[in-house]
Regions:
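A short helix->loop->beta-strand "cap" motif at the edges of active sites that frequently abuts
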Residues: 35-40, 79-80
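Conserved beta-loop-beta element that borders a ligand/cofactor-binding pocket
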Residues: 45, 71-97
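A conserved pocket-lining segment of Rossmann-fold NAD(P)-dependent short-chain dehydrogenase/reductase
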Residues: 106-128
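Mid/C-terminal beta-alpha module of Rossmann-like enzyme folds, strongest
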Residues: 124, 130-194, 207-230
Length: 230
């Protein structure tokens, strides 16, 4: 779970919520799979414990995902092979499945959300496609190294470069101003490495896990076309 699932009514703290649904529930699921006879498994995690380890113990979400990742990989044994794939920001398209955030990005880049300010936040990050994640997951299930945390990724972009790809794909090219303001679609509350942070790295195990790279621009073009026609 992430910030989207945290109750906003004050009924539970983020720390307690993440502890229950991540730290406790996810390892319990993998333990049940192991007891049921599953011999190989892959945990889909987040890149923050590896690229923003300074946030462990400081940010409840990053702390929780780190705890969960370590607990799952600790189950590795001669009879149970388990590794984790730690992902950056993921994008992809499944026909018939609408993602509100993607729909909002398309509308924003198309100029349909004229009430929102047009700019880019500071910093940037790595992105990967859901297709590449599927390829890596299949490979990891087949021959992933037990107990290993793989840091996956495709391309590094500043938020300015990334958003300008959306505007270009929407037929509304822009040279975006970079501001320190909270962005309406990429707010600081989801920037778990820290507001304005730049997360840039060379992905691991690209050949070992045989996943495609340099797919971001083409995927954005596909998404804009699909959502514009919906």
């Amino acid at each position: 779970a992430d910030i989207r699932q945290v109750p906003m009514d004050g009924s539970v703290t983020p720390e307690d919520f993440y502890r229950k649904v991540n730290d406790e529930a996810v390892p319990r699921f993998f333990a049940a799979a192991r007891e049921a006879g599953v011999r190989r498994a892959v945990y889909i995690g987040t890149f923050y414990p590896q690229v923003a380890s300074h946030r462990i113990g400081e940010c409840p979400y990053v702390t929780s995902r780190s705890n969960t990742d370590e607990a799952v990989r600790a189950m590795s044994s001669d009879s149970f092979t388990v590794c984790s794939l730690n992902l950056p920001f993921v994008m992809g398209h499944i026909p018939g499945l609408d993602i509100p955030h993607i729909g909002a990005l398309v509308a924003y880049a198309s100029g349909a959300l004229s009430e929102l300010p047009v700019f880019a936040p500071k910093g940037g990050t790595n992105h990967i496609t859901s297709h590449a994640v599927a390829q890596a997951t299949l490979a990891a299930l087949d021959h992933g190294e037990s107990g290993r945390a793989y840091l996956l990724g495709d391309e590094n972009y500043s938020w300015k470069e990334y958003l300008e790809l959306w505007f270009e794909a929407a037929g509304n090219p822009q040279t975006l101003e970079v501001r320190e303001d909270d962005h309406p679609l990429l707010p600081n509350v989801i920037m778990f490495a820290g507001p304005g942070a730049t997360v840039s790295y060379k992905p691991e195990a690209v050949e070992e896990l045989a996943y495609d790279r340099h797919q971001i621009k083409a995927t954005i073009n596909t998404l804009v076309k699909a959502y514009s026609e919906a």
